[in-house]
Amino acid sequence: FSATGDLLMTLGTPGEQGGGPKHFTSPSDVAIAANGDVFIADGHNANGNNRVVKYNSRGEFLMSWGETGYAPGEFRALHAIAIDPNGRVFVGDRSNSRIQIFDQEGNHAATWTQFGRPSGIAFDNNGRIYVADSESDNVQNPGYEMGIRIGEYETGWVHEFIRFPWANPNILPGNGAEFVTVDSEGNIYGGEPVPNPHINARTLRKYVR
């Protein structure tokens, strides 16, 4: 869409699931590179296409990479995609409890597990990465809990953790922030799309820096 809400482009075929350059199964996130290339995370659930699809700014298919699996370059329910200020593509491989990092041609560069089960990824201009984890618990990802982890996107070092503000963060996995962004003043916003075990269900929550 344009900044005024006008539809500019449609990718995929409405009402039809599938593979190839003209179909998706469950696109869950999108990232735009500095040159206008479009990267789509196609695989909201573990049985979807589980791939990253790349188009140019005119919507012309360029390439895709990934399939269902556990190895580097394979995914299970990729739920988030974002491009850091260095141009690297960060993919939230949620059901594998990891972030995979690629260059823009799909070459695998690194795998990080210290951010939990990533549902949303964002960056600021001060070297920080923000990762929303809405699913970690003692069953799905032992040793981790739901929350927003803040670290350094160059090194992967995690130095801050925002616990979700209800009494027991380990009940009802999937009910925390699934989407995260940050403003120019460092305030953090977490989108909570699923009913939570507190009165502020389905909300956008602001955490003041």
List each language-model region with its residue ranges.
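Eukaryotic scaffold repeat domains enriched in small/polar residues
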Residues: F1-R209
